[in-house]
């Protein structure tokens, strides 16, 4: 991912304020509600029958936190996202058979959730930087599919 020094600083500064548990659960929950076909990967999570059930589901929250913690690790290695996410890419490709398009969808949902949580602080410039990052992470996670 090519970010300017200013963009890297802004992305890192905002990430330091992110409540990974809250934002992760909301982002994964929104993915499952907005794109319901993604629920098939989470059948073991229990009740996903309504938007309310999804958003309150403790398994969704827990996995969302795990996903966002991994994303945060990626922010520490922006110059080597493919290396950082190689094992996760292999897992999602070979064992879980996740459609790599879902990584892009989740990245876009994450940007929406960050905008919701940070309001005016989430400027268009910061959104642009985060869009670059989530696109880079999605590409890295899809790497083993090629």
Swiss-Prot record:
Which regions span the lipid bilayer?
Answer: none
Q: Which residues carry this modification: Phosphoserine?
A: 44
Q: Which residues form the Globin domain?
A: 2-146
User: What residues does heme b bind to?
Assistant: 63, 92
Which biological process annotations from GO are given for this protein? hydrogen peroxide catabolic process
Q: Which GO terms describe its cellular component?
A: blood microparticle; haptoglobin-hemoglobin complex; hemoglobin complex
Claim: Acetylation is one of the keywords in the record? yes
Q: Which residues carry this modification: N-acetylvaline?
A: 1
Alphabetized UniProt keyword annotations: Acetylation, Heme, Iron, Metal-binding, Oxygen transport, Phosphoprotein, S-nitrosylation, Transport
Q: What domain of life does the native source organism fall in? A: Eukaryota
- Cited Gene3D superfamilies: Globins (1.10.490.10)
Sites of N6-acetyllysine modification: 82, 144
PTM-bearing positions, type S-nitrosocysteine: 93
Q: Which residues carry this modification: Phosphothreonine?
A: 12
Task: Give a GO molecular function annotation for the protein.
Answer: heme binding
Q: Which Pfam families match?
A: Globin
Tissue distribution of the protein = Red blood cells.
Subunit info here reads:
Heterotetramer of two alpha chains and two beta chains.
Main role?
Involved in oxygen transport from the lung to the various peripheral tissues.
* UniProt family annotation: Belongs to the globin family.
Its recorded name reads Hemoglobin subunit beta
């Amino acid at each position: 991912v090519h970010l300017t020094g200013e963009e890297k600083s802004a992305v890192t500064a905002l990430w330091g304020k992110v409540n990974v548990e809250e934002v992760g659960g909301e982002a994964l929950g929104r993915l499952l509600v907005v794109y319901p076909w993604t629920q098939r990967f989470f059948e073991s999570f229990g009740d996903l029958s309504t938007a309310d059930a999804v958003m309150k589901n403790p398994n969704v929250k827990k996995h969302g936190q795990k996903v966002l913690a991994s994303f945060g690790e990626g922010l520490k290695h922006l110059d080597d996202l493919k290396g950082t996410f190689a094992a996760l890419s292999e897992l999602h490709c070979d064992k879980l058979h996740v459609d790599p398009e879902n990584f892009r969808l989740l990245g876009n949902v994450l940007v929406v959730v960050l905008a919701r949580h940070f309001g005016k602080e989430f400027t268009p410039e910061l959104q642009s930087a985060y869009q670059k990052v989530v696109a880079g992470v999605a590409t890295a996670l899809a790497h083993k599919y090629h």
